[in-house]
A protein has these predicted regions:
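Sequence-structural signature of mature extracellular/luminal beta-sheet repeat domains
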Residues: 1-140
Length: 140
């Protein structure tokens, strides 16, 4: 079973065929100060496993999809709400980590590997917005 662990065996879950809804019993609050951020009536789903670590989610409401970075695997992934499928949006991503949309709906990303901030245009081309500050390269 993909991603099997002690919680999967205990709860008889199979991540290949289903999604677990909140409250997710396998989510453990390690730092008690975080508990105040848990909203009892808010939904939470695990939509993907397989990232070494993930961050930088950016929601594209008009297209009903979510982009996020899988930094060590050097890719940006895309989850589509309609189908629930996950695909690669961009690889290599130059280890992009922070992502956000601009006012025109384009993706802005901070690239760790190239030490630059880029904008992905609607046609998929990538343009550099910034790669230095006061003649010094960005630091990450």
């Amino acid at each position: 079973m993909v991603g099997e662990n002690k919680f999967d065996r205990h709860l008889n879950r199979n991540w290949e065929t289903g999604v677990v809804s909140y409250p997710e019993p396998a989510v453990e609050i390690i730092e008690e100060s975080f508990r105040k951020y848990v909203i009892g009536n808010a939904g939470m789903e695990r939509i993907y496993t397989g990232c070494r670590w993930a961050e930088g989610p950016a929601w594209f409401g008009d297209g009903r999809y979510l982009l996020w970075s899988d930094i060590p695997n050097n890719r940006i992934l895309r989850w589509t709400e309609e189908t629930g499928s996950v695909s690669e949006f961009r690889k290599p991503s130059n280890n992009a980590n922070g992502n956000v949309r601009d006012r025109e709906g384009r993706l802005i990303s901070c690239e760790h590997l190239t030490r630059r901030v880029t904008r992905t245009e609607h046609d998929g081309t990538v343009n550099v917005i910034a790669d230095s500050f006061r003649n010094f390269p960005l630091n990450s």
